[in-house]
């Protein structure tokens, strides 16, 4: 059982996924800091000095922190857009390289027989022209 798990865990896809999750988590922290520490204070300044993180409604003992929700939504959209742009660039590079490979692959490669047949055809044309 342990051997099977080890083989599964060391497969390329699982390791790649783990690296992606770790990098994604770090990227999320960077974007969260960008939103919380740079963008939201500027947006709050433009809207008259509003600090979104402190916005809330109180219903008795319950507190609804809708300001934090607004920050989280902005955070989500920035992360989503960043990932979208990153994937779009990667796909463009991937498909550009793929098209170049296809062009190389579609270049006609003649077999030995085809080359010989073309030589025979050319020789027959020359013989006809000389008569």
Curated annotation (Swiss-Prot):
Its main location: membrane. It is a multi-pass membrane protein. It comes from the Bacteria. The chain crosses the membrane at residues 8-28, 30-50, 67-87. GO terms for cellular component: plasma membrane. GO terms for molecular function: mechanosensitive monoatomic ion channel activity. It is found in: Cell membrane. Pfam families: MscL. The keyword Transmembrane helix applies. Signal peptide: none annotated. The keyword Isomerase does not apply. Keywords: Cell membrane, Ion channel, Ion transport, Membrane, Transmembrane, Transmembrane helix, Transport. Channel that opens in response to stretch forces in the membrane lipid bilayer. May participate in the regulation of osmotic pressure changes within the cell. Belongs to the MscL family. This is Large-conductance mechanosensitive channel. It comes from Geobacillus sp. (strain WCH70).
